[in-house]
């Protein structure tokens, strides 16, 4: 299970780390695109197994941000 990026831009802030429990609808990161801050929201619940991108990375639509385990949805 993964949480992916919805649009291209710079990954400005990541709010979670490996081992964190996240809930569906929780803001997990902020993307900066076209001088706007766009929240990245988890579309499922689970435990963060791995954060695949780091702050400052340029990301594309569809890139995997988080790998999750023990998803409850």
UniProtKB/Swiss-Prot annotation:
Q: Sorted alphabetically, which InterPro entries does this protein's record hold?
A: Biotin_Carboxyl_Carrier/Decarb (IPR050709), Biotin_lipoyl (IPR000089), Single_hybrid_motif (IPR011053)
> Sorted alphabetically, which keywords does the UniProt record give?
Biotin, Lipoyl
Modification N6-biotinyllysine, positions:
35
Induction of its expression = Detected in log-phase B.subtilis cells (at protein level).
Q: Which PROSITE patterns did the record assign?
A: BIOTINYL_LIPOYL
Question: Which Pfam families does the UniProt entry name for this protein?
Answer: Biotin_lipoyl (PF00364)
Q: Tell me the ranges covered by the Biotinyl-binding domain, including all copies.
A: 2-69
> What is the protein's name according to its record?
Biotin/lipoyl attachment protein
Q: Which residues carry this modification: N6-lipoyllysine?
A: 35
User: What kind of modification does the protein receive after translation?
Assistant: Can be both biotinylated and lipoylated on Lys-35 upon overexpression in E.coli depending on the growth medium; the nature of the modification in situ in B.subtilis is unknown.
Ranges in a coiled coil: none
Q: Which NCBIfam families match?
A: PRK05889.1, PRK08225.1
Source superkingdom: Bacteria
